[in-house]
Each structure stands twice: as C-alpha cells, then as structure tokens.
UniProtKB/Swiss-Prot annotation:
GO terms for molecular function: serine-type endopeptidase inhibitor activity. The lineage of its organism: Eukaryota, Viridiplantae, Streptophyta, Embryophyta, Tracheophyta. One of its GO terms (cellular component) is extracellular region. This is Trypsin inhibitor 4. The keyword Disulfide bond applies. Inhibits trypsin. Gene3D superfamilies: 4.10.75.20.
Length: 32
C-alpha cells in the first residue's frame, strides 16, 4: 500500500488540517 507522507514532527492539532502534508490529527492531540 502507498505510505502517507507525514514528516516526523511533533505538532499539536485539533483537526487534520492543522497538520503538515498527509498527517492526520490523532486522538492524543498530536499529528501523526
């Protein structure tokens, strides 16, 4: 399967659009 492009940077978020590239906002409140 195609890997999502997600830089390994710890970023706080409230929604997916707060995150870089193809990262999504995870339940613990950080992008991943």
């Amino acid at each position: 399967h195609e890997e999502r492009v997600c830089p390994r940077i710890l970023m706080k978020c409230k929604k997916d659009s707060d995150c870089l590239a193809e990262c999504v906002c995870l339940e613990h409140g950080y992008c991943g």
